[in-house]
């Protein structure tokens, strides 16, 4: 650090960045021209994480949402107990393998085995993607885009040949959109590769990032397995078919209304719990990256065990904030599921105008879903580093978007688009596996093809969710790095001069810093 002199800040009203003879560009500290010179959230060097990232007046933020979450978990466990008991009691009727089920009217053990294949395949592909990203960051971005375009078009062609036109059109749209993203953003890939390389280097320095991601992947896969079985068991327990033996098992009688009501709750709880798992991992990894950015090169050194300290904060003071933001996303996901069901019903009735209306509505709700997820990603970085409530973190995020919005969006377009495309890649393969499985095993409940759409859609959803959680380590590292770079770029300039210069060449706005605090 002695080789790099500290930044010599320009006067507050100086309109240009100053450049000395050593070609060092200095950071403007007063981007917003505010008068609150008392601002300083910068962590202080210490061997203790809580002392470095100090929380003033520690308290359990947003605790009512944490209580609500645990009530949802309790409800899910209760439903799981009732439905799994019905599945166990009628196990011989459902069948114990791929073939030989007496249940010919709804999902059975044939589907459970399919979901097991789906989860294992998604798990293996997710682990392989993390290894690839660590070994070749630039190739990770380029290959991710190209591979998804090729696979998407190939899958669409396959479905066209099979005359499964609805799936073919959906996959073709995804493929064409991926091609457009690559073509329009190819000149920005060097900046993305630089940032991704930095994130991967930190992964190498802190193996706890990978350990946290792997543990999250295990938890997500385990919950996905339980979620999948509970969905099947719910159909088994509450389907009102006269041949359903599970109706006589404890837990209430069968009816269409009960089936729909329980499924709505199960899907909501599944979305909610999955989101909380994902965001807890995000907060833990954000704490590790924050430790590296601010304290790795300090005289005192970085705090010990940042992952455990971040996990402790995520599950105590910050847990209510995590469940708050996750609830918003889960409700939006549930609304999108309702829209999808209505669209399917309109299509079955031949109501073209209804289908068009639902497609338009789904587009707007999908945009809101993307926007909330986008804001949550950065808000949770503030939650992780400063222990703030969800609302205060959201306000800080709005300031970040207000002054760095386009920069953050561009940053996300290149790295996170690649991550999302890898998630789509996994989902493509798993959805194709689900289709082929149903086609070749020919379960009786799908003799008319009525279960192709829901099973394939669920396979696509669950595989994408597992993969997104596994890639949280990269997404969280990128978001945390951008937040820290926006608030304190001079630290990175002093401690990582060459990397900072690489970023500056592609992103001169890095010299502007945000000084607001809520």
Swiss-Prot record:
Pfam families assigned to the protein according to its UniProt record, in alphabetical order: Choline_transpo (PF04515)
Cytoplasmic side stretches: 1-63, 133-139, 185-210, 278-314, 373-417, 467-518
Keyword Membrane tagged: yes
Transmembrane segments: 64-84, 112-132, 140-160, 164-184, 211-231, 257-277, 315-335, 352-372, 418-438, 446-466
Cleaved signal peptide residues: none
Family designation: Belongs to the CTL (choline transporter-like) family.
PANTHER family per record: CHOLINE TRANSPORTER-LIKE (SLC FAMILY 44), PROTEIN PNS1
Protein name per Swiss-Prot or TrEMBL: Protein PNS1
Organism classification: Eukaryota, Fungi, Dikarya, Ascomycota, Saccharomycotina
